Amino acid sequence: MAKVHGPGYSALSKGRYSSIGEQYFLTFNLARPQTGLTEPELLAAVRREWVRLGEARHWEVRTAVVMPDHLHLLVRLRAETEVGDVIRLFKGHLAAVLRPHRLNWQRSFYDHRLRHGEDAFPVFRYIFLNPYRAGLLAAGESWPGYFCDAEDWEWFRTLTDEGTPFPEWLELR
């Protein structure tokens, strides 16, 4: 059945812009009901690709988590490139790696641009807690698909329970 969008759907992207230094909380998924992004080969490929795009000066990944069926990132744009274009590069380069595993990306993505002065801590915490809240590991364990930039980890780690979540964080929704 074709998706039918209500009035105003096409206007959602009007007025959107991307500029150097803007921070975006991004989420993109595998097509449902696929899983497998956390397989070691695929996890390594995902990390290599976000590093490659960083080295190409498209973005700086501040923190990210790779889950079995989706991925969350907090990025800072580093080039005059639309965020959607960077995501297309990312997903496009990874498509060839996913194909032999019979995996493919969902077409769309979620993005939220952080406003100037908006506290990034809630996004860092959300990304950090994602595998714990999904029940994929216990509070005292570390998730292999989690990444935090070294500079950001210096301050964020001090707000954790020695690199793992405080029990009360897991109770927050």
Regions of interest found by a model, annotated:
Residues 1-173:
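Short catalytic/metal-binding and nucleic-acid-binding patches
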